[in-house]
């Protein structure tokens, strides 16, 4: 593993890449990565709603669920810039989102649920449990609107498990934030950037999962 990661770092340095980042599968692996120069850097909130206790937010706007497809035209880059304009986050292009769309649609019955200028990537992980891996909604009202749309699209799940941005105000009362993902700066400029963000304690949102 060390040789592979060292080789990857050398290749990316030649490409002028600033960072490498990854998600460890367990605490033991996390400690191993720390020895190789990686450090915890990204944060999320993990929220679980039990189906029967999932309270449907009240809103009048209709749900517009969009199945994953190659022609998904939602302007995700602009939406993410708008939602996370005051938040550090990893920016994905339309191609990245479309790839995730096809992956979760083909293998997990996935769907992108939209509500106004907001969207969420949802899929079934097991036993009628819904996983929401990318909840892209900014303010309190937009989050309620998107939650309502998700509930309308998937009204009878046993559990609803969310991975959301740690800075999302709507979810702050539901759970504490936790680290999800590690980073390794590859040059002095990147090291300074990581240090400044750590000092601000505004840890970035990784968005699409890497595991």
Question: Which residue stretches match the model-derived regions?
Answer:
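Helix-turn-helix
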Residues: 29
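Conserved acetyl-CoA-binding loop-helix of GNAT-fold acetyltransferases
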Residues: 1-14, 35, 140-152
């Amino acid at each position: 593993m060390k040789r592979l990661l060292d080789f990857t770092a050398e290749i990316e340095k030649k490409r002028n890449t600033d960072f490498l980042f990854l998600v460890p599968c367990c605490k033991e692996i996390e400690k191993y990565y720390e020895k190789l120069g990686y450090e915890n850097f990204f944060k999320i909130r993990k929220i679980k709603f039990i189906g029967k206790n999932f309270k449907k937010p009240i809103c009048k706007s209709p749900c517009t669920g969009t199945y994953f497809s190659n022609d998904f035209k939602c302007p995700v880059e602009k939406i993410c810039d708008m939602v996370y304009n005051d938040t550090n986050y990893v920016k994905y292009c339309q191609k990245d989102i479309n790839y995730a769309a096809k992956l979760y649609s083909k293998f997990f019955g996935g769907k992108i649920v939209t509500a106004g200028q907001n969207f969420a990537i949802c899929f079934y992980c097991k036993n009628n449990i819904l996983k929401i891996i990318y909840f892209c909604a900014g303010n309190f009202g937009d989050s309620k609107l998107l939650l309502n749309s998700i509930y309308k699209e998937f009204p009878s799940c046993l559990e609803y498990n969310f991975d959301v941005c740690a800075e999302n105000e709507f979810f702050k009362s539901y759970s504490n934030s936790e680290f999800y993902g590690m980073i390794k700066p590859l040059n002095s400029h990147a090291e300074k950037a990581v240090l400044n963000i750590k000092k601000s304690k505004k840890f970035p949102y990784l968005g699409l999962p890497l595991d």
